Each structure stands twice: as structure tokens, then as C-alpha cells.
């Protein structure tokens, strides 16, 4: 089943379409909740799952056999630790069971925090590539 939203990027729509309709609906709800708070973010597949990216990864989400996974990073888990007690969570991930209602308000608060945290951090330039040694002797060696 293709996404009902024609603006869903093709790789994301393909990812979502691979799941049963009830899981697709949950993935779309998570996507829309995050998109509302990260309108400038680019959507892409990273680590084989849907990702919102804005100079760096903001937040990922994914579907599994028994849960929807949300991956906001370790710092977000620490900030929202008290609100996450009802859910399985680890260093940078949260599991929302498929048989329970999605906590969309919590997902939006986490997404808003991720956007704010990202906007507060400068985007670092990629590291400069070291120059190539000229053909000939290796550094520190002389020719005879």
C-alpha cells in the first residue's frame, strides 16, 4: 500500500509500504507527528530506517514485529526518562508496543526537543581530507 501522502519521499513510502496496513498507519502517524515539528528536515533512509535529517540525524523511527521504535539519541532519553518509564527504552531507543495506543503527544515533545537541541548546536564541517604525499619517497625517507 503506497503512502496516502503524495509528499512522502519515495524511499520512505517504500519502507512504510512493506508493512501491514495497521503498522503503516502507525508509521505514518509517527512520521506526521515528527514532520509537524521538523518541517525543514530532510527525510531519508539512514541505518536502513526512516530518518529526519537537518545537518545531522535528528530522529529515526522504524517498525518491528511487536513495536514501533523511536531513536532520538541518548541525550533525549535522559531528558524524557521519567515519561518513558511505561515503555522499554535503552540508551538511544524507545519501543512503543503495537498493541498499545501510540503516545503521539510524547513523540512530539521528544521530536521538538530533538529539533531545538539540533538548532542549538553548530553544524560542524566535515573533516578536511589530508593532502596526498607526492609520488616518490615516503615521508621521512630520502632517495639515494
Regions found by a protein language model. Give the residues of each.
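Charge-dense, helix-prone N-terminal extensions
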Residues: 1-144
Amino acid at each position: 500500500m503506497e503512502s496516502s501522502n503524495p509528499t512522502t519521499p519515495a524511499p520512505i513510502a517504500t519502507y512504510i509500504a512493506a508493512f501491514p496496513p495497521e503498522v503503516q498507519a502507525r508509521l505514518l502517524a509517527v512520521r506526521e507527528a515528527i514532520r509537524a515539528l521538523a518541517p525543514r528536515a530532510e527525510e531519508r533512509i539512514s541505518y536502513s530506517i526512516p530518518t529526519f535529517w537537518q545537518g545531522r540525524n535528528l530522529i529515526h523511527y522504524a517498525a518491528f514485529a511487536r513495536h514501533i521504535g523511536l531513536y532520538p539519541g541518548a541525550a533525549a532519553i535522559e531528558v524524557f526518562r521519567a515519561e518513558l518509564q511505561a515503555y522499554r527504552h535503552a540508551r538511544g531507543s524507545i519501543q512503543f508496543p503495537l498493541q498499545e495506543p501510540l503516545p503521539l503527544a510524547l513523540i512530539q515533545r521528544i521530536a521538538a526537543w530533538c529539533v531545538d537541541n539540533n538548532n542549538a548546536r553548530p553544524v560542524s564541517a566535515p573533516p578536511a581530507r589530508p593532502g596526498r604525499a607526492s609520488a616518490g619517497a615516503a615521508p621521512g625517507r630520502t632517495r639515494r
